[in-house]
């Protein structure tokens, strides 16, 4: 069932997909498409455990992080059984927040340049005053 026309798309709810999280029925989501990887578990080059950890949920981020080859991406199309229901797409887990804060692209330039520049000037002046006392 590699290629599906828009008319024949089968939609699955997140609740349905989450029930298929064991070795006898292993489904996962990649880019809102639902894959039945049950028959592929033993053939997966990274081992069956990798797939089973993601079973019943969204594996998109992990799939992309690994950097799968073009061949792997083409092969994955043969396991598509449908798509995640559009109403459930917003429910997908967002990546967990980390302790590392990232600078928001909307933050102003002064927080990135002016504050460090002023700090550097202050340190330079303090050094100069300290050296002038000697």
UniProtKB/Swiss-Prot annotation:
User: A GO molecular function for this record?
Assistant: metal ion binding
Outline the extent of the Cytochrome b5 heme-binding domain.
9-85
Locate the transmembrane regions by residue number.
109-131
User: A Gene Ontology CC term for this entry?
Assistant: intracellular membrane-bounded organelle
GTP-binding as a keyword of this entry, yes or no, is no
Which sequence positions carry the modification called N6-acetyllysine?
10, 19
Which domain of life does the UniProt lineage start with?
Answer: Eukaryota
The answer, when asked if Ion transport is one of the entry's keywords, is: no
Function field: Cytochrome b5 is a membrane-bound hemoprotein functioning as an electron carrier for several membrane-bound oxygenases.
Q: What is the recorded name of this protein?
A: Cytochrome b5
Q: Which organism is it from?
A: Homo sapiens
Name the gene.
CYB5A
